[in-house]
């Protein structure tokens, strides 16, 4: 991660790294790969990822999306450093929980949410299945989907229980890692789910 963000050209740096496995083989999450999506979207749309996020999510959900870090070429970070409030992040989780619907509008193509939740690989760190930007973790007998950020930031969506959970944590290094993530899941399963069911 360090050599990548300290390079002069993040996209070039990612594209010139060797594969960790053959295509279709072992998956190793890479923030650099997520950044490539931001670069491709910026290039194809002719607009910044920030502008698109504000138009496609910020305006319809009535959330504030502040500017975040960019690479040396001016492309907004595709893998991290967004600074959403917990309430605004919960609105994005609710949008996914409702399959991309906001009232009677679809903000995403109809099958996008289900497609994004299909297992495409497994985390080398947690062994959790991974789709398009979402990991899977069942809790209390129901499948849930989560995105996690540095330092223990967590968005967890459980459609069957009509539940969206946002957890924020101290992002001061070092990152607490997978053991902390498991404690967050335990908190959801043992305390939050029973609280909303009662």
PLM region spans:
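Structural helix-adjacent loops and short alpha-helical linkers that scaffold large soluble proteins
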Residues: 42-54, 100-108, 124-125
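Structured C-terminal helix/loop/strand segments within mature extracytoplasmic catalytic/sensor domains
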Residues: 149-198
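Active-site Gly/Thr loop motif
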Residues: 8, 63-66, 113-166
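Catalytic-site signature segments of enzymes, centered on catalytic residues
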Residues: 1-80
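Carbohydrate-binding/catalytic loop surfaces
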Residues: 71-84, 130-141
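Active-site-proximal alpha-helical segments within enzyme catalytic domains
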Residues: 33-40, 80-101, 153-170
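Non-transmembrane alpha-helical segments in soluble domains
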Residues: 11, 15, 38-42, 53-54, ...
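A beta-strand-loop signature enriched in Asp, Gly, Thr, and Trp
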Residues: 68-77, 99-123
